[in-house]
Amino acid sequence: MNILIKSAVKNFIVFSTALYTSFSFAQSKLAIVIDDVGYHLKEDAAIFAMPREISVAIIPAAPYARARNQEAKSQGRDILIHMPMQPVSAVKIEDGGLHLGMSAAQVNDRVNTAKNIVRDAIGMNNHMGSAATADPQLMTYLMTALQEKHLFFLDSRTIGKSVAGKIAKEQGVRSLDRHIFLDDSNEFADVQRQFKAAIHYARKHGSAIAIGHPRPNTIAVLQAGLRNLPEDIQLVGMGNLWRNEKVIPPKPFILLFSEVPAPTSIEPFEPVGLLRGIPK
């Protein structure tokens, strides 16, 4: 009798172990970048209390830029230079930004200054910049400077006719595009809707890059959303996408009686349209 029980247990363990190792769930990547960091202590503190996979984009001219860079570095958080760039509108940008008509030397000097402030940045994205990112000459000068410093470029896509990605490729600079703006609108329901859209985009395409800002409703949506992130979505820093790193496999499920897995989570997200409007 004991022999039969031991044999059954042994076979059951072998069976369940085989299923344990033969099945895994695919995951999609979600990268979230918070722009305009360095201005507001309270809101910045809330962002820095979030998982370190949330990347921060620091404006070099912001009063707390150096301090936020140091804090992000100490947390192991990915950092971007949030570079002010000329928009199509007449809105004035911060000091140290990039304007149409600048020479290569001027652009290089501005990038050097920004990197000396945001010292641990691994990349750059544009603050405004609807005119700048559509200008081939300015983008050529910028990508040349970024290539020398081994920085990647995240195009915030504030204008549809941006040439930043095209020029980056020509200059040997890794370039990525923003897919979702979380807070074109500051209304809680709208930000929540955009967060769901980012989840949907990641599932459909394998990865998604969402950009938001340190604002109360954005913070509230992220605090709730990140606590309940579906198991098929992996939150990653921007460096993960820049380096094309593989997702970390989720914990496998032990399938005891069926090879057909139960769902990992109840689907809380639906395909939704994106909000219209030009950000910033």
Swiss-Prot record:
What Gene Ontology terms for biological process does this UniProt record contain?
Answer: carbohydrate metabolic process
Q: Name any one Pfam family assigned in the record.
A: Polysacc_deac_2
Q: Which UniProt keywords apply?
A: Signal
Keyword Lipid biosynthesis part of the UniProt annotation:
no
Show the SUPFAM superfamilies listed in the entry: Glycoside hydrolase/deacetylase
The residue range of the signal peptide is 1-26
Q: Which domain of life is it from?
A: Bacteria
Please tell me whether the keyword tRNA-binding is annotated for this protein: no
Q: Which family does it belong to?
A: To E.coli YibQ.
PANTHER family in the record: DIVERGENT POLYSACCHARIDE DEACETYLASE SUPERFAMILY, UNCHARACTERIZED YIBQ-RELATED
- Protein name from the UniProt record: Uncharacterized protein HI_0755
